[in-house]
Amino acid sequence: MERFLENAMYASRWLLAPVYFGLSLGLIALTIKFFQEIFHILPHIFSVSESDMILTLLSLVDMTLVGGLLVMVMFSGYENFVSQLDINEGKEKLSWLGKMDATSLKNKVAASIVAISSIHLLRVFMDAKNVPDNKLMWYVIIHLTFVLSAFVMGYLDRLTKVKH
């Protein structure tokens, strides 16, 4: 009975495979939105204001960071929790594949969230005159919470590595 339960639990990790595949569908949707934003701005490229152009570019950078985060979570999560990716060595293989454990993935996700939050906060500050002060305050508090959380996770990771 024990062996059956252990095998069933071990096999259940494959339930995560469609979840990681679903993230790739999210990446497709994000790519469509990315190019939709580009095609939206192109006809107005010569008439758009500098601040609107910067806001558009920040949106594109934001989407790019989210896309990178999705790729990182998809591949690292799949390799850490489901099965090793069977990709031939060579130019196409990402250098970090197989080298990122759950802890380093968590730290990279936290750093990515801070970067995404920073860009969002910059976009808010560029339009600060139209944003109520209390809303600005909450954006800053939420961003600082992300920064502090990422710092604490990195610090705790460093502490556990030193002790072992």
Swiss-Prot record:
This is UPF0114 protein KPN78578_33570. Its main location: membrane. Belongs to the UPF0114 family. One of its GO terms (cellular component) is plasma membrane. Pfam families: UPF0114. The chain crosses the membrane at residues 15-35, 53-73, 109-126, 136-156. Disulfide bonds: none annotated. The lineage of its organism: Bacteria, Pseudomonadati, Pseudomonadota, Gammaproteobacteria, Enterobacterales. It is found in: Cell membrane. Keywords: Cell membrane, Membrane, Transmembrane, Transmembrane helix. InterPro entries: UPF0114 (IPR005134), UPF0114_bac (IPR020761). It is a multi-pass membrane protein.
